[in-house]
Amino acid sequence: MSEEQSTYSANPGKQLVRTVDGVDYQRIPVKTHLITNTDDMADVVVRYAKDRMQEGDILFISEKAVACTQNRAIPMEDIKPRKLAVTLSRYVTKTPAGIGLGIPETMEMALRECGTLRILFAAFCSVIGKLLRRKGWFYIVAGPKARGIDGPTEGTIPPYDHYVVLTPD
């Protein structure tokens, strides 16, 4: 590890080395400017990562950053949840993983992204799953677009701490 690499630090609860199938992978965080919808992700990669990469490296980009460049980060105040979103969000299990669809604004965006019928069917399946003591059925049925919706959480960089971020296109 170079001297520069030894100065990297992981976010709380994260590690710089991940082991997958017995192979260690080093995660090197790359600090950028605040990425917005005015950025082109290819330009961001060239500007910040090109000189750090070596032959055989794999570059991972957070889907939240990609979504922001695609104008898929919506200010909370621009989302007007319908009654159905308010009602459904009350039944979402809160987890340490994040807010998920547990607030009306994120549930509203799930209804828009996935369709009302699909979300209602996912909610129905979730009830059946709970009766059978099985978790996760809602997100399995609702699909990746619902599963990937991020709401504002503590530690999110402003201004995105007041945004709902959808999955990238």
Language model features with spans:
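N-terminal and secondary-structure boundary signal
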Residues: 2-169
